[in-house]
Structures are given as C-alpha cells and as structure tokens.
Swiss-Prot record:
Disulfide bonds: none annotated. Residues 7-269 form the Pyruvate carboxyltransferase domain. It comes from Leptospira interrogans serogroup Icterohaemorrhagiae serovar Lai (strain 56601). Homodimer. The gene is leuA1. Residues 394-501 are annotated as: Regulatory domain. The lineage of its organism: Bacteria, Pseudomonadati, Spirochaetota, Spirochaetia, Leptospirales. This is 2-isopropylmalate synthase 1.
Amino acid sequence: MDLKDYVRIFDTTLRDGEQCPGAAMTENEKLEIASQLATMKVDIIEAGFPVSSPVQFQAVERIARETEGPMIAALARAMKADIEAASKALQPAKKRRIHTFIASSPIHMKYKLGKEPKEVLKMAVEAVTLCRQFVDDVEFSPEDATRSEPEFLRELCEAVIAAGATTINIPDTVGYTTPAEYGGLFKFLLSNVRGAEKIIFSAHCHNDLGLATANSLAAVQNGARQIECTINGIGERAGNTAMEEVVMAMRTRKDTFGIQTQIKTEEIARASYLVKTITGMLVQPNKAIVGANAFAHESGIHQDGVIKHRETYEIMKPETVGLSSNRMVLGRHSGRAGFKDRIVKLGFSPQVEELEAAYQRFLEIADRKKEIYDEDIRALFSEEARKSTGDRFQLEGFTVSTGTKSTPTAGVRILIDGHVREESATGDGPVDAIYKAIQKTTGMDPEVSRLVISPVTEGQDAMAEASVTLEYKGDRVVGKGSSTDIIEACSRAYISALNRL
C-alpha cells in the first residue's frame, strides 16, 4: 500500500495508556491486549519503556516474542542506556522500531534538561544514529513540539532525518494546541523540512482541552500519515487520542478525509471492553463510538426515524465496530451450543475449559435472571476467561447479615491451594465486612484504593460488574467480578485481584 494514501495506527495503550493512574497491567494482561491489537491489524504497538524497570523490560520482550503481525516499538530517551535496553528487549520481534525522544520546547530545554538548543540537537542526532545501529526503523519525537520554536523544530527534524530517522512524531505533549495550529504546524514542516518526503510524519495528541481527536485529524489533513493513540483514549491526565474515534471518523467521513487506515473496525468494541476490564477504567456512557449510549435512541422522534430508515439518525452501523444491532436473549433453557454460538459471535475464541466454566456460571445466573443479554454474557465470560488454573484463591461461598440496627457481619468459604478455609468478620457495611473476612482467610490485607460498581444491563434483576483496585507491598492490581448479587460481584472482584498479587 502506498504510504501516501494510508494512515498508520501506532497504538500506545501499553505505554502511554498505562501511565493513567490506576491503569497498571500485568505482563499477561499486556500480552492479551497486544494480541487483540494484532487482531485489529494495528500497524505499530508501542509495548513499553524497557529501561524504566525489569518488569517493563520483560513485558516488552515477551510481546516482541509472542505477538505476530504488527511492528513492535519500544520507547527510549536520547540516552545510550535507554536505547541499548530498547534494542535488547525488541530483539525477538520480526519487525522492530526504537522510538527515541528529547524535549525541544524552550521551557523544557531550560528547566527540565538544562540544555542549550545546540546541545539538544547534538543529543538527538547521536541518539538516532545509535538507534540505526540496532534497527532500520527509528522514530524520533521532539517532546513538547507544539510549544517549540518552529524554526528550531524544522532544524531538528532535518538533522534527525539526515541521521536516519524514518518517522518523526510531533507530540502535543500537554494538550495545548488547537486543530488550526496543529494542522498548520504539519503543513509548515512538510513544506520546509529537507527530506520530509522520505519519511512519515506522525501525530501524538493529549486531550487536556478535549481536542485530541480533532487535532489528530487536522494533522492527517495536512500530511500526517501516522496517528498515535490508545484504546478508549486512556492516558496521562485527560488521556490520549482515542483510536476508535480517529479510525471511525476517517471511515465515516471518507468524503472529507479521502484516506483510510487498515484497522479491522469490527474488533473495536471487543478491544474497548478488554481494556476497560483489564484496567478498571470505565467508559463513560456517552463516549463516542464505544459508549453504552453511542447507538441508543430514546427520543420518540429519533426511534421512529431509525425504525423507518436507520440512516435518519445513525451515521454508522453498530456492526461496523463489532456491536450487534439485535441483542440476543438467552435464558435457563438455552443449551451449550447456543451459548457457545453467542460467545463466538461476541468475538471470543473460547477454550473448552473456559467455555464449560462460563456455561456453569451462565446457568447460575439464569436461575436468578429471566433474560440474559449479550452484555451479561460478555461480562461473565470475560471474568471466567481471566481465571487461571494456577489461581491460589477460589470463592466457594459466603454469607452476609446486615441491617439498619445491626452490625454488618460476613462469613466466607475460600479454597486456598486446594484446602477449604472459613472465617467471619464484621465491618462498616456488608462489602467491608466480607473484605475483612477474606483478609482473615487469606492472610493478606491489601488496601482497597478504588471500588467501582456498575450495572451491566438495565432492570431490577440486572447484572452488576465490580472493579476493585488493590495495593499491596508496592504492587497495584485490578480485579473484576460480575453477578446479579452486588456483594457477590464485589467478592469475586476482590478474589480476582488477590490472584494477581
């Protein structure tokens, strides 16, 4: 495909996205997301920042070894140790990219680096030159580019192109720019940088002013041929450009943009749900493309129009992002075949053991809930699929007693390394009581830093999904649990998190 009529998608969910508070992921979780990104046909996956910690290094190395299809990138400051660590971590990958950066704005050079522009220019050239000794594909980012002097930015870009950079990324590091300014900056650079026609210019935007998507699209309209983004727009502060938004904007408004990505858009909903489940970062209902209300129509006038002709109020079909236009309803009389068929249609590839465990949970839920929808099935299957045969703790049962004039008391029965243990405790509410009982049973007392309970579907018998973030001895993990019983959902989430510590 000609690079000039194709926008590369550079996904940084595993690097920039993970910098969002509370979004830390385990190595296995990162690999799971990387696999989904590969299924979506993402062009480049930024797997992490190898020099920052042994855990980061191992995660990048494993993704490089086990993820087929996309190019795997690793971040490195313009420093020899960073670049060497990135190169080593990327070694198993078939397609490798080192992404090196250094600040270029006056405020960053003066107060963060304590360097003069000439020194920064020299460091950038040396970094790119060193990168090219290890890989053929090198990306360079002048950090805080949108607050940099345009002429210095031009000089810096020319120098790193001459040194061997194949992609130059123009980051709006603090989310300060506007579409007109950002588009104008790309137009200036592509028109004035010697060698610009030989490389790819990339957009990397943050959402501090709510303009990340608009800015990225303005860059594309002015020559950018790569967008750096994350699933659900997660990232530091207000987040990054949301992949689903820029991809669907270019697809839906191809008349305006005249250019496409190669993303398999039918995988967007599954990717969104996966990232939400793993990180515990909920998606707002009115979030474009992947929010629960994105394709909902409550107004009678709108409903009437959609029934008569979908395009009256729908500019894209839910099926294009992997959502079913018709919600399938299952119940207690649904068999394994129907259940498996629905799981597959929701985008999962179940193993025999996962399917059986999920089906047994489905039957339990069906005894309490008359109608089970796609959202319910997705929640319970995701929970079962995340379990491991090596999990130390399994919730066997619990009891709770509470009331307005009684002390909340909970008892739990937990299978620990094959042996059943029971304990009880009191607490400030039923959830606190059951968490304290679990702590007594397991001998672990992590701090609950975050607990979010949200309905999966509507109605009195709706499934609830709980997400709990635990902190223990320097580690932070997220656990998820679902049930029609809120206390059970919270208990399952807590046990799920403990198994990740």
